[in-house]
Amino acid sequence: MKKSEFAKKAYENAEFLESNEARTLRILSEYLEPLKRLNEWKVNSTIFFLGSSKAKVEEKDSPLTRYYWEAEELSYNLAKWAIKLKQKGKNFVVCTGGGPGIMEAANRGAWRAEGKSMGMNISLPEDQYLNRYISPELSFIFNYFFMRKFWMLYKARAVVAFPGGYGTLDEIFETLTLVQTNKIS
């Protein structure tokens, strides 16, 4: 009996998994896979940094460059503090959206301190990449913004906001709404 090209296991059928009918499975995957990985790496608390993706180290005259270095330094100090806390059984990790600019600066500060840092990137039509300072085991790429924001805030014990654009404002207002409605504290 010849194996049919239609006889695929549903979970191995890429065409199905990318279809509208499988959207719920993709959403569930973006909940369960990060949960499993964060549990494996014992990440129970994060310090979430947000801010402009446009802040560049090379652009000395840009007003955002100052914030890049401030985010990097603050993240460095918080990561050093988190390393001391880890010895007491608490595992704080720096968390960002995983992209360039302020996100890179925060991941870079944690990397410089030899601490763990997490990046939660989003799949976009234009070039979007994970910055090189993220701990590889804590690198995530999401398809859905709402799942990305869920994980950015779910383990957050502190939120640090730097100047940014619409994405930063969206994340700030989402956080404030969740605090105001007692969904997070």
Give residue ranges: language-model regions.
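Glycine-rich beta-alpha loop segments
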Residues: 3, 8, 14-120, 128
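Conserved phosphate- and dinucleotide-binding cores of soluble alpha/beta proteins
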Residues: 125-185
